[in-house]
């Protein structure tokens, strides 16, 4: 029975309760005690109460620690037995749920796994024995403010003492107001104090949380409550704990005295936080605790005076889980991140990073998101205490980094991009780590800004792109200051013709270094050569930029225009597209007297050109691309397929144009594969347009199931050349390059096979019929079931001996695998650029909750291991542990000779993740597993 509050509820909220209780016996068959009253609301707004006949109350329900009592006489033995039964304290449970309240922990809304529905199982971790499921109840989703919500009370028996203004309830007592509900075996409600006392099997529910206890005090007008000997549950977050007492504030904040916090199952005490005072705030999604110990199996393993932790997936300001590690570069390192939740659309994180060998590095980032843009600012500063590099050229004691990344739209057509990073010295990323998102450790860091405009039939782009060196073993690249492009198609198509155009204007500049170089010991770096004084004494090492000669040292402006006309003809059975393109390029070059003198010396070599300040190049390109499409329905091993046969014929003619006088600003030769058979330029970039007179033939075969799933794809092709390819990179003479004089290209093969959606195999293979040898090839096998992504197997092999490389020691381009340096040089390595490697990785469950993790990457060319690691993972419902032993090749610039900077390193890595709290140690494990094992990120994203 329920009655809504009268108008004066705020002043006398218990009057309703008293009246409700007094009225309850009229609607039940229970006999009620003497001194009970039947009460009705009078016409004047007061209460009209009449005494009822006397009678004995039925016995109160017995609960742990409570003696049965009644207004009548009872047997002394019964009273004694009840009084002797004392409740078990939560502190005696050692982090587990109280079995004395329910053997199956149902008092915590725990539902065993076998009783969960399919939808509930989908939200439950694979190694969890069940889940906390909030039972459906009236008002559980009520959002009405409490001061506007009526109060509903139900009980088997009720009694009201009008003079004392006390209402007594017994038997399945339920009080509900808005979304909050209180349950108990019995209750006393005090009208004068707006207060209630609950006894026996107390449960207080509100907004996905549950507090269970022996007794409780509740403020009926505000919802404030105190529950003694309490256990609590937050259902969606899989959080539970206990406390000597729990206080629930009016705003639903829960405060625990001598409380615990864990995400483990009720029967597990694998880990828990135990603190003097714990506060859980469902409104913010975060909790705090003071004087905290992290306990594993009830043994303390870590202490902190304060901790700030999440209780759901929302953002909030506070400390993030710390991480610590050790390495030869930094020594012991401790990172204690602090997160600032400044607004829903922007935040910041501070990363104080203490390194025993280097001092305190302060790093931070600020992220923003607006209706039209997103990005981040970041910075870091360290006054380096390490002396390892103090004598090395380019080293700075005050080390810093700044970075800005931005993407935005000024309107629906105009877009902006910024990718800017600056560092104090080229050794920054080799010595120091960063936690900033999007900052990559590469040989060069970008300093780029761009403005893009998209029209209906064209795109325009203004780009400024510079580089900052993050190594001393690479040549300084060209900056584009600026670059303007304008590409598109004409909006009309007379007789089916398509008209297109590509235009570019760009300025290339770089400042080549020519100062002396010294290594970390202060000695001349002799890897590239030495500089001597007039007396023949060595005074320092040569810069790697000094290996550049002649026109390779030039700066310049490049203007390029490439209009085209094509006639695409398409049908369901095939296509035919003749195309004519005309490429005009103009160069204005700047070269100092030293470079001009070197260019004059090199001009005697047919592989090099001469210097001209102004160069014009005109090259027509004619191509015909065609293909047919055949398909049929077939069946294999009982499965229906649509089998296709797709032959393709491509003819390309590009006349020879001498381009030896043009420097390479942004151009290189592409690697040969099946796709290159159908390109109109074998170079990537504008500075070289390869002469061609060839006919390429390829064919593709596919097997496609009725549902669109491609089971298999096989492609094979070859090009037939009608003349030699004379255009080459500087230093390469086509007359000494066999594949430039061959009449046919290598056979190019590609193959893909999907055993099912879990097993995949990919391969490519290029075989040279002239040398009867393999030019390049790879094979990759990947297994990861969709229904169990915890299983991963990768096995791959790569071989390549046709790489076009630049040798910084000689300043020349080389064909084939390529040696580093020349025979007789101190740092000479034969076939340094040849690739012959295998890569095997696996993550595999061996028994429930235990998985092995391994990777082995081996270089057969130099008979060395590039990376090897092995370990195991233990995963449970509430915590995860990984222990991995790892060997890898590290790179550190101690000289300008790339091979000498490679060194083996070794480490043992431990990662512990407390689910619901975060990683305690070993967060670095995530990075090398993600980079080294294909499928690892998918596995983690789908993990509980």
Curated annotation (Swiss-Prot):
Its main location: membrane. One of its GO terms (biological process) is lipopolysaccharide transport. It comes from the Bacteria. Residues 1-33 form the signal peptide. Pfam families: LptD, LptD_N. Keywords: Cell outer membrane, Membrane, Signal. Component of the lipopolysaccharide transport and assembly complex. Interacts with LptE and LptA. This is LPS-assembly protein LptD. It comes from Pseudomonas entomophila (strain L48). The lineage of its organism: Bacteria, Pseudomonadati, Pseudomonadota, Gammaproteobacteria, Pseudomonadales.
